[in-house]
């Protein structure tokens, strides 16, 4: 184990101490537990984000799609196409 010093504000310290007391562990042990949880679940965010996207499909099916009209966007894209071709 390596020693690391960090600076915490008063609110963070109080919250950690309260949670540590509830869990029956020291502040240092709680910080280690929280770090381990954050580090081991870091990749899960992508999976949960993708699941949320998949779950959202079809939720707005009752809405009519917006009407697309020609306008500045098409002209801009045509200019970009000509400039890069």
From Swiss-Prot:
Protein name: Putative antitoxin VapB10
GO terms under cellular component: plasma membrane
Region of interest (Disordered), ranges: 64-85
Function: Putative antitoxin component of a possible type II toxin-antitoxin (TA) system. The cognate toxin is VapC10.
Domain of life according to the entry: Bacteria
Entry annotated with the keyword Disulfide bond: no
GO biological process: regulation of DNA-templated transcription
Keywords per UniProt: Toxin-antitoxin system
Keyword Kinase: no
Source organism: Mycobacterium tuberculosis (strain ATCC 25618 / H37Rv)
Pfam families to which the protein is assigned, alphabetical: RHH_1 (PF01402)
Biased composition (Basic and acidic residues): 64-76
InterPro entries: Arc_rbn_hlx_hlx, CopG, Ribbon_hlx_hlx
Gene: vapB10
């Amino acid at each position: 184990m390596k020693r690391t010093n960090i600076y915490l504000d008063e609110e963070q310290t109080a919250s950690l101490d309260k949670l540590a007391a509830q869990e029956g562990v020291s502040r240092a042990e709680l910080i280690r537990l929280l770090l381990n949880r954050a580090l081991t679940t870091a990749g899960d965010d992508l999976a949960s984000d993708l699941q949320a996207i998949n779950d959202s499909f079809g939720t707005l099916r009752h809405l009519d799609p917006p009407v697309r009209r020609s306008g500045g966007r098409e002209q801009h894209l045509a200019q970009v196409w000509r400039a890069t071709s």
